A protein has these predicted regions:
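A polyanion-binding, active-site-adjacent surface
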Residues: 61-227, 232-237
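Cationic, low-complexity basic patches in intrinsically disordered or flexible, solvent-exposed regions
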Residues: 17, 32, 116
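Extreme N-terminal basic, low-complexity initiation segments
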Residues: 1-12, 16
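C-terminal accessory regions appended to core domains
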Residues: 10, 46-51, 64
Length: 237
């Protein structure tokens, strides 16, 4: 592993669920019940149900002004109309909670931004946090690579779950360059307008005091040149 891909020594988060988090509720049939915004997403409900427009209107928190300003822009309106129209036509789109990363990691708490490409496109995988999968799901190769790097660099133990919610609650913004994807169609929503939204988020974080940016893949690395030199920037293929 080249030096530029190594994790900073102070990145010592555990992959375990956050202390005190309640167990997932279940329906009488034994299936996981839908969770409130910001909560864990069951494999049964990880497909998009609520239109993007509704999720934008309902979003609260520090990111709300930025999100609403983007949604009112030409690029935002086009993207929302595109995704909502496909959803209404019956397309299966992931994840269910598109803005979950922003809900769990407010701007003022961001210490690390891990930027990926687009959500996992298989059933039960994407849960609104880049690289994270719900507990009990097999780990995709990208997640295994992240854990392997943390083991090698920091000696972190292998977590029991592929959920990275604990990281998000400790200031690690787990963001993809593109926030939605059609089932079994990688990169299907690339170039539709999400990149402009991601750029606004990165600009906001770039104005913060020192932050570590971990840019995973070429689409993410396109943002490297716009980052202030006071930040730590780590790039990985």
């Amino acid at each position: 592993c080249a030096p530029m891909t190594r994790a900073p020594r102070w990145l010592t988060y555990s992959g375990e669920p956050a202390p005190g988090r309640p167990k997932m509720a279940r329906t009488p049939s034994g299936e996981p019940a839908p969770q409130a915004p910001g909560g864990a997403v069951s494999p049964v409900v990880n497909r998009l149900v609520d239109p993007i427009s509704r999720q934008v209107a309902a979003f609260q928190g520090e990111w709300a002004p930025l999100l609403q300003a983007w949604a009112a822009s030409d690029a935002g309106r086009r993207l929302i109309a595109h995704v909502d129209a496909r959803l209404a036509a019956g397309a299966i789109i992931f994840p269910a909670q598109v803005f979950r990363a922003l809900a769990l990691t407010p701007l003022s708490s961001v210490r690390v931004l891990i930027l990926g490409q687009d959500p996992y496109h298989g059933p039960g995988q994407a849960e609104g946090l880049a690289f994270s999968v719900p507990a009990g799901q097999p780990w995709p190769p990208s997640l295994r690579n992240i854990v392997k790097e943390l083991q090698r660099d920091l000696g972190c133990p292998v977590p029991s779950s592929g959920s990275l919610e604990a990281w998000a609650r400790q200031g690690v913004l787990l963001l993809n360059t593109v926030l939605t994807v059609r089932a079994h169609e990688a990169h299907s929503h690339r170039g539709k307008g999400w990149e402009e939204f991601t750029s606004r988020i990165i600009q906001a974080i770039n104005r913060q005091p020192r932050v570590a940016f971990v840019l995973w893949g070429k689409p993410a690395q396109k943002f490297a040149e716009s980052l202030d030199k006071r930040h730590l920037v780590i790039e990985s293929p």
